[in-house]
Amino acid sequence: MSSYLDYPVCNRGTNIFSAKPGYHNLNHGYLSSNSCATSDSYAPDGRLAAPTSAPHQSPGLPLHHQTHLDLPFAATGNSVYGSHLDYGHHQYGLAPEQDRSYVHPQVSPLGTNMAPYTGDSCGPAAANGSQYLHFGNGEQRLQEYPDNVYARLPPQSKKESEHVEETCKTFDWMKVKRNPPKTGGASEFGVPGQHNVIRTNFTTKQLTELEKEFHFNKYLTRARRVEVAASLELNETQVKIWFQNRRMKQKKREKLGGVLVHREKASGPESSPKAKESEP
């Protein structure tokens, strides 16, 4: 390895390295924008164009395959820097008749010639989804492919749409509600009941008549309940609920009154201040 890459350094001031006889030169240096000679041309739209002609050699000599790596120029300040790398490697010995018909391909910088240059990185070709294929003889071809493959899918057939509709069909058992609302049926004497019980605001006349009826009868019979409801323009349920609430209210009053009476009895006349003053 060391004997093959044995490069003595000569003429160090000009940054030129001279190799042993029989090997190619490896040139590194800063080149100006006018003196930089490249094998490929740099197009203004940001793409790298192919060379116009391929190198040919005499039939008697072995074919030397070179790779050129051309980098875009970067302007910094007042000077322009560029790099031109020439790698000399892979000597091929071909017959004269093979050398005439052989097309020199353009090898990638990494030593593989399987990936062509694509215009997806910059320029208008990136939007169109195309590839530029470069060949050694200067030919340039544009390979196009559809932008969106999924946009050209065939539409859904009629049978498939019918199948989807059948799977999404709503059956009768799915329409049944789990908690059906309560419906108010007819009352005992033919008076229709209400669907939703709403708090009734009784008028003064209705409250007076109900209080009179409650004073005489705390519990009403069915016949009397219907008569009171018809006379007060109420239904049987409203009269029944009112009497239930009135009885509960009366019980609370009696209970509260009983507690007060019991407290008065427990205190007695001896504990009262008037009884103490009247005593001698």
From Swiss-Prot:
Keyword Nucleus: yes
DNA-binding region of this protein: 195-254
Gene Ontology molecular functions: DNA-binding transcription factor activity, RNA polymerase II-specific; RNA polymerase II cis-regulatory region sequence-specific DNA binding
Main location group: nucleus
Region described as Disordered: spans on this chain: 46-65, 249-280
Keyword NAD: no
GO cellular component term of the entry, any: nucleus
Basic and acidic residues bias spans: 261-280
Cellular localisation: Nucleus
Motif extent (Antp-type hexapeptide): 170-175
Pfam families: Homeodomain
Keywords: Developmental protein, DNA-binding, Homeobox, Nucleus, Transcription, Transcription regulation
InterPro entries: HD, HD_metazoa, Homeobox_CS, Homeodomain-like_sf, HXA1/B1/D1
PANTHER family on file: HOMEOBOX PROTEIN HOX-B1, HOMEOBOX PROTEIN ROUGH-RELATED
Family membership: Belongs to the Antp homeobox family. Labial subfamily.
Function of the protein: Sequence-specific transcription factor which is part of a developmental regulatory system that provides cells with specific positional identities on the anterior-posterior axis.
UniProt name for this protein: Homeobox protein Hox-B1b
